[in-house]
Amino acid sequence: GPFALDKEYPNWDDEGEYTPIFKTIPQIDHVSVWDFYPDADATNMEQAQYIIQRHKMSRTELRALKRRPYFRESLIEDAIEQGENYTKKYWEDDLIDYNTENEIDRFEVLEYWGMIDVEFLEDQAIEIPKELKKYDELQVNVWCCNGKLLRVVLNPFKPARIPYMASPYELNPYSFF
């Protein structure tokens, strides 16, 4: 989906001192079909109650999440202390020719977009806006790794929606893909 990203542009002043310029720019990315898990009962994104995206991250990439909004620094460090937890799936050997990553240990980080009980949000000390208190479920974005909830936030999009688009090669009225 589209997100804002702060990008650093190299810049030097008249004295030769490095003074980078930071601009917020839109970012869009693709997700491999192997890392995208939509609602199993949905046949398209409009019907999906949730999606899960799997991220394979290095220790450095996981630590970089601490600089992004609403990520819980101490829980990220706890997840790192537990060690890399990614295990290669059976079908990934078939994709080895397309592998752009080095064969080093990784963390499996799961990103969830979808509905969740308000009770759970209150247990996580998430402040529920007054106008949303009447609902039993709300749309959220949750990141987890090694059993740690790295990020739990209400869906920031207005209206709340899952920020993914899926384009199947052929439409099948009985299946997502």
Regions found by a protein language model. Give the residues of each.
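Extended alpha-helical, oligomerization-prone segments that build pores/tubes and scaffolds
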Residues: 1-177
